[in-house]
Structures are given as C-alpha cells and as structure tokens.
C-alpha cells in the first residue's frame, strides 16, 4: 500500500493548501480534501491541480462540497446537509496520497466530531504546517499536544514563511518533533516556483520513511 499522509495546520490560512500542492506534486501522488467549504472562488482541489501539475484523475473528489466558506459543521447546516463522519474513509491509491484537513485540528465537522477525531480514527501520520510568525509557538505546541493526547503519529512540522531560527528551534525542541523543512513565501506563485521552493526546503524522503513519533 502507498503512503497516506494527513496535512493539517495550526490554524486557518497558514498555507497548508499550497504546501499540500507542493507535497502531492513532489510525490507524484494523489490529493484529497474530504470536505470543501466555499465554492464561489477557486476550491482547494482546484488550487492543488493548478500548482501541483497533477491531473484531475489524481485529485480525489470531495465527499462534501459546501457553499459557504465557514467551518464545515456550520457550512453543512446552512446547506441543509448532514455530514456522516463515519463514511469519511481515507482512500487507498496506487501512489502516495496527501489528505488535507480544514483549518486546525479541532475544527468541527459536525456538532459532535472534530477533524482530530477523524485523524485519530484513521491512524495515519500527520504533517503539521506552522507559521514562522509571532504567535506560532503557542499554536504549534498546543497542536502537538493535542495530536499526542489522541495517539496520532506526527511525521513532523513543516514551517511556512520567512526564516525564524529561534521560533522554529523552540517548537522542535519543546515539541520533540522532527523539523521537516520550511516553505518560503513564493512570488509569483506558480507551479514552477513552488516546485523549486519545495525542493530547496525539504527532503522528499522524509515523507515516505517511517519517522512519525
């Protein structure tokens, strides 16, 4: 069976969709966003296709497509949809699969279930995407604690933003996690520039080895 990796973030807007596109492209794999909230602009799946170079056949269809760009539990209620979290099972594919969550770990899927509940059931390794800006130490360490409390394997932390040696170092040391690398902000953001930024910041081998802890 090919590797399956869950990408989550310390909060909304950290850059995990761009990171997921880079990772899925580098792995020449598949991508899946279980629940898409917000359809008026480019969806996360469309962004990944545009930036990763993966064809539509490599992007697994969303289980739920909800109109409003809010937390999935509320978006579903506004659409009159009931999310059946038990039906959300990570697909098996013939290439590595990157699964992207929504917002942070405790974003609710329903009034009773969070994304972290889903991750704990899947038992798949998680890559935590974290900013390098002010405030990220607390957010990152809380997220690491939450994953460990549910016995979810942490593949490592992927930083996104400008280099911040002290901030990155204290998160890695206090969180006792692997630093996978850092994805710099890219301007202009294109398939080619993202591919190069990922290659400069990461070792793709770290995402396919058994290193989670």
UniProtKB/Swiss-Prot annotation:
**What InterPro entries has UniProt attached to this entry?**
DTB_synth_BioD, P-loop_NTPase
List the subcellular locations: Cytoplasm
An annotated GO cellular component? cytosol
User: Per the annotation, which location comes first and is thus the protein's main one?
Assistant: cytoplasm
Q: Which UniProt keywords apply?
A: ATP-binding, Biotin biosynthesis, Cytoplasm, Ligase, Magnesium, Metal-binding, Nucleotide-binding
Enzyme class name: ligase
Positions binding ATP in this chain are 13-18, 100-103
Q: Required cofactors, per record?
A: Mg(2+)
Reply yes or no: does the keyword ATP-binding apply.
yes
Which positions bind Mg(2+)? 17, 100
Assembly: Homodimer.
Entry-linked PANTHER family = ATP-DEPENDENT DETHIOBIOTIN SYNTHETASE BIOD 2, DETHIOBIOTIN SYNTHETASE
What family does the database annotate?
Belongs to the dethiobiotin synthetase family.
* Protein name, per record: ATP-dependent dethiobiotin synthetase BioD
- What is the species of this protein? Nitrobacter winogradskyi (strain ATCC 25391 / DSM 10237 / CIP 104748 / NCIMB 11846 / Nb-255)
